[in-house]
């Protein structure tokens, strides 16, 4: 007998959570795909971090980019493993397959949907697609509970559906802090390579796509008064436009390129302030990474990871208010104490990974 966990692919920012669900809840970990083809990830490095052997589901792929899948062995896995708990990927076809099996064969196992809805999506009717909106209305009442990344969304689901467990996308700081320490030599090289010695650094990490609101972010930088360098780590379809836009604002912006693993961690060590200006962001796992690295964070109120921000570790901004964003960045830059030496800063997360996982496991088992 084994509990079952289904998800589209292994994501680096969720591996610690996946490991905990495997070890603490006895889940067989099943995935549609080996990795997320839309992102440039270190697939081999992710596999090494897994404390489980992933099972990749057989089936028929369809949809744009073949990102969707009709999994042909779901009922076989349910029948052979006799689970008490089945965790499914929000409102996908597989979720319907699991629910049909439960209802047709009158099974008693608990179906829990892991859902990445942000508060902006549910509260402001700002779903990515109309299909997702209607799938929520259909499926949310049928599952037994929901694992939700944003505490505000948990409260919304509790109000509308009487269900919801808060499980933010967070890494285990016990593992991550030594990784930041290991990355310090790379951080020192960055300071030399990009002429950052003696300068305060504002950092963005992510894809250069419309949802990240980077055009408005760059325009807001043009309104700031403090002296700092902005480093943009990532790549994407809008890079050319953003480079052109940055030439006319009178502020220094470094387009550093795409990095993974220790290459990204080293940038968090260099940074003084982190920013996520997205206008549409289901979560934003980079916020957790920045906070563990000790970076005061200026985060869009539209991002799910806004739930990680307190008065002690950052501030929230309206992604459409350029003056407000500029003011928040200036205030953050005045607040932080810059050290020209590269050191690992104090963890600014408002809670510990184990505390969240222990609470989630307890609620799932109830």
Question: What do these predicted ranges mean?
Answer:
Residues 94, 109-129, 144-145:
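A short, histidine- and acid-enriched strand-loop-helix "catalytic/donor-clamping" loop
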Residues 136-186, 196:
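Donor nucleotide-sugar binding/catalytic pocket of nucleotide-sugar-dependent glycosyltransferases
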Residues 185, 191, 196-212, 218-221:
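Conserved donor-binding/catalytic core segment of Leloir-type glycosyltransferases
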Residues 243-259:
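Nucleotide-activated donor-binding/catalytic signature segment of Leloir-type glycosyltransferases, i.e.
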Residues 258-259, 266-271:
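Short alpha-helical donor nucleotide-sugar binding micro-motif in glycosyltransferases
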Residues 279:
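Aromatic "clamp/platform" in nucleotide-sugar-dependent glycosyltransferases that forms part
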Residues 292, 296-299:
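Short hydrophobic beta-strand element within catalytic cores of glycosyltransferases
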Residues 311, 315-322, 331-337:
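Conserved acidic donor-binding segment of nucleotide-sugar-dependent glycosyltransferases
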């Amino acid at each position: 007998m084994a509990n079952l966990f289904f998800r589209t692919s292994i994501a680096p920012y969720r591996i610690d959570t996946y490991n905990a669900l495997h070890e603490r809840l006895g889940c067989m970990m099943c995935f549609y795909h080996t990795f997320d083809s839309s992102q440039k990830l270190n697939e081999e490095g992710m596999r090494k971090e897994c404390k489980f052997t992933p099972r990749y589901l057989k089936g028929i792929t369809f949809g744009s980019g073949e990102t969707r899948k009709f999994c042909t062995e779901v009922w076989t896995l349910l029948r052979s493993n006799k689970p008490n708990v089945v965790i499914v990927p929000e409102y996908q076809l597989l979720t319907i397959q699991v629910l049909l099996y439960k209802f047709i064969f009158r099974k008693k196992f608990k179906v829990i949907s892991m859902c990445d809805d942000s508060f902006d999506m549910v509260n402001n009717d700002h779903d990515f697609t109309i299909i997702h909106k209607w799938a929520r209305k259909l499926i949310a009442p049928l599952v037994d509970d929901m694992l939700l990344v944003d505490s505000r969304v948990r409260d919304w689901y509790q109000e509308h559906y009487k269900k919801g467990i808060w499980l933010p996308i967070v890494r285990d700081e016990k593992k991550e802090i030594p990784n930041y320490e290991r990355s310090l030599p790379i951080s020192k090289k960055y300071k030399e390579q990009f002429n950052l010695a003696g300068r305060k650094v504002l950092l963005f990490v992510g894809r250069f796509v419309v949802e990240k609101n980077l055009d408005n972010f760059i325009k807001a930088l043009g309104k700031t008064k403090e002296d700092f360098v902005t480093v943009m780590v990532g790549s994407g379809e809008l890079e050319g436009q953003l480079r052109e836009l940055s030439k006319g604002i009178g502020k220094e912006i470094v387009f550093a390129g795409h990095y993974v693993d220790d290459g990204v961690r080293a940038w968090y060590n260099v940074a003084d302030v982190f920013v996520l200006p997205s206008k549409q962001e289901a979560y934003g796992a980079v916020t957790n990474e920045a906070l563990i690295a000790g970076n005061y964070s200026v985060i869009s109120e539209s991002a799910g990871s806004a739930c990680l921000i307190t008065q002690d570790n950052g501030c929230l901004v309206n992604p459409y208010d350029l003056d407000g964003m500029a003011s928040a960045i200036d205030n953050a830059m005045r607040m932080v104490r810059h050290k020209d030496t590269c050191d690992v800063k104090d963890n600014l997360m408002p809670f510990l990974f184990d505390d969240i996982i222990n609470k989630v496991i307890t609620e799932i088992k109830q």
